[in-house]
From Swiss-Prot:
GO terms for biological process: rRNA processing. PANTHER family: PTHR39159, UPF0374 PROTEIN YGAC. The gene is fau-1. Keywords: Endonuclease, Hydrolase, Nuclease, RNA-binding, rRNA processing. It comes from Natronomonas pharaonis (strain ATCC 35678 / DSM 2160 / CIP 103997 / JCM 8858 / NBRC 14720 / NCIMB 2260 / Gabara) (Halobacterium pharaonis). This is Probable ribonuclease FAU-1. InterPro entries: DUF402, FomD-like_sf, Ntdp-like, RNA-bd_FAU-1, S1_domain. Belongs to the FAU-1 family. One of its GO terms (molecular function) is mRNA 3'-UTR AU-rich region binding. The keyword RNA-binding applies. Gene3D superfamilies: FomD-like. Probable RNase involved in rRNA stability through maturation and/or degradation of precursor rRNAs. Binds to RNA in loop regions with AU-rich sequences. The lineage of its organism: Archaea, Methanobacteriati, Methanobacteriota, Stenosarchaea group, Halobacteria. Residues 89-158 form the S1 motif domain.
């Protein structure tokens, strides 16, 4: 099985996947690092770092996506995987539900019980777009479930591929590779034109033939499905390739460091630091080029250089095991402790309702004080009134915390521990954790870790 890898995790993933799969279309830097020549062949699956650098997307044949996804899911306890209901190239019948400044929100129906929406830019559709309009659309750029963006859509059909992309009704290229392709014993379906990638410049005629044949088969599958589609409700018509998303947690990023370290000098927290901010990428490369880093993750240096520090505002990004991410609000960093590798964040609360599981009324002006320790599996939030009276403590059990420059990230593991104003300590939401395991959203090893942490916290409180 052939796998293509791109993005900041490429070196580590090439080392990890190379023992089980054939790596193809490797970039020049990867070939230099591995001191190897990788074939330019058709990829059964492509693994690409997500735009926010928090994880990776997989696209390709259903079998390949499933196999590679299984391999990467085993990377660490805090790696999460979800099937993409709207992978690149998928065709939907959609209905416009809202018009925005640069495009329209499109209802794409449901896939496997999950509602799907997309975003259709106005420059990708002819004529005026209004609510209630219906279009046949294709996913041009998929988006991970933990982000805020919707999959980007287009009305023109294309068949994605690593070496060649088929475009409906466009003109052919004039490159040397395009001229070489005229010698191939296979032609694209009528009305489709091949657009060859730069990687194809180094491909053999056999590889080009295989790529064009696969793309042509996908094009025929798409057109047959489009012709046969008879629907007036939003929904997916066809998906010529499968997709999946993986969210890496802190433990998984450090495990990826170990794979990269087998090939290249790698500082502790290499991937964790690069995932936090693009500004750190050059600094990490510079540090690794100067010396052989060792020891622990340099929390003090990283947070001092890139943030957060006292006075900064950070968002609490509360990830859910089903893939969503919810913001618990922003707060001010009131303390940064380099030795404890922690920050303390304060938020002023609005009035109304009660504190979850604590049961105490929430008043306007209450202060929530939260301490986040890098790498810890839990964090406490102490709620106090404006005059300092303690209302309760809520301890969230989660995947290892990552303190990024403008946000604290983790995935919530449902079970929590609370302490009321009277000192009563309770463990809550075990049933939600059990349900998440039953649904396949949380692995049993991860759930067991969450239960162990919750038990220890309850005993300590």
């Amino acid at each position: 099985m052939n796998v293509r890898v791109r993005g900041i995790y490429t070196t580590a993933l090439t080392e990890l996947l190379g023992g089980e799969y054939d790596i193809v279309q490797a970039s020049p830097p990867i070939q230099r690092r591995f001191e190897a020549s990788f074939p330019v062949a058709v990829a059964d699956a492509t693994v690409r770092t997500s735009d926010d650098r928090l994880g990776a997307g997989i696209a390709g044949t259903a079998d390949a996506v499933d196999a590679v996804g299984e391999t990467l899911s085993a990377l660490g306890r805090d790696t999460f995987r979800w099937t993409d209901p709207a992978p690149r190239g998928a065709v939907f019948y959609g209905e416009v539900t809202e018009t925005l400044g640069s495009g329209a929100v499109v209802d794409l129906g449901t896939v496997d019980g999950d509602s799907v929406e997309g975003f259709l830019p106005y420059n990708r559709v002819e004529g005026y777009v209004d609510e209630g309009d219906s279009y046949r659309v294709q996913v041009a750029s998929p988006e991970p479930p933990w982000g805020d963006a919707r999959p980007s859509l287009a009305t023109a059909l294309r068949i994605p591929g690593g070496l060649v992309e088929l475009r409906r009704g466009s003109e052919g290229g004039l490159s040397e590779t395009a001229r070489m392709a005229d010698l191939l014993p296979v032609d694209p379906p009528e009305g489709w034109t091949p657009n060859w990638s730069r990687a194809a410049d180094d491909a053999s005629l056999e590889a080009m033939e295989a790529a064009l044949r696969r793309a042509s088969d996908r094009a025929e599958t798409v057109m047959e499905a489009v012709v046969d589609a008879d629907r007036d409700e939003p929904g997916r018509i066809v998906a010529p390739q499968a997709g999946a998303w993986l969210l890496f947690g802190r433990e998984s990023r450090f495990e990826l460091d170990e794979y990269r370290r087998q090939i290249e000098t790698t500082m502790p927290g290499h991937h964790r630091t690069k995932a936090a901010t693009t500004a750190a990428s050059a600094a990490v490369d510079f540090a690794e080029a100067l010396c052989e880093p060792d020891g622990a993750f340099p929390f003090d240096v990283v947070t001092r250089q890139f943030g957060p520090t006292e006075g900064d505002d950070v968002t609490i990004s509360h990830g859910k095991p089903d893939g969503r991410t919810i913001s618990l609000g922003r707060g001010e960093v009131t303390d940064r402790d380099p030795e404890a590798e922690s920050i303390t964040v304060e938020r002023e609360m609005s009035g109304g309702g009660t504190y979850d599981a604590i049961g105490v009324k929430r008043e306007a002006g209450d202060i929530a004080t939260t301490t986040f320790v890098e790498g810890r599996w839990w964090y406490p939030t102490v709620y106090c009134s404006a005059d300092g009276e303690r209302r309760g403590t809520y301890v969230n059990i989660c995947t290892p915390l990552e303190v990024f420059p403008d946000t604290v990230r983790y995935v919530d593991l449902h079970v929590d521990v609370v302490k009321g104003p009277d000192g009563d300590v309770r463990r809550v939401d075990d049933d939600e954790l059990d349900a998440a395991v039953e649904a396949g959203e949380i692995s049993e090893p991860l759930a067991e870790r969450a239960r162990e942490v919750a038990a220890a916290i309850k005993k300590a409180l």
